[in-house]
Amino acid sequence: MLDAALARFLESGYAATTVDSIADDAGVSAATIFKSYGGKPGLVRALCERALKGAGPIPAEHRSEELKQAEPDSRRLIEGWGRLTAEVAPRVAPILLLLRDAASGDPLASALHGELDRSRLKRMSLNARHLVAAGHVRPGLGLAATRDVLWLYSSPELYDLLVRRRRWSVDRYSQFVADAMIAALL
């Protein structure tokens, strides 16, 4: 169902996609989708959750936490975050951008977009707190500024601009994100 939903959303957009069309594509009833996901917002939430897990058997968020605990060198830590950002962005950015674009015309999409954006900001706050507490950021750069830098460079908009629109490779994007965060923070 999720694969059918993703394909339909990306092809038709959020507003034009119906649960019935997703159900037809998935070979299930609309009632099954409503029972499993509660409708379009629930499908998008499930798609985001799946995308944020990343490519490996261990979810990217857990690998980020493991990296924080295992890597004492701030430069290598941020390079690792750059790789994780580049791993997750191709999966999640199109979904988040679709939701962002739908938010102005759909209150449920707007609420979900706000929730997911706040969740990313919270994750970046935790990462910033780690960097600041460990004394990794340059003097004068506080928690809020560190958080905002991490939040900026993990944004779906940046991925969209560089990879989807400017045709950068994901490897180039990964290196850019790491280099830019290092330059801004260390």
What residue spans do the PLM features occupy?
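Short, basic, alpha-helical segments at the C-terminal edge of helix-turn-helix-like DNA-binding modules
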Residues: V19, C48-A55
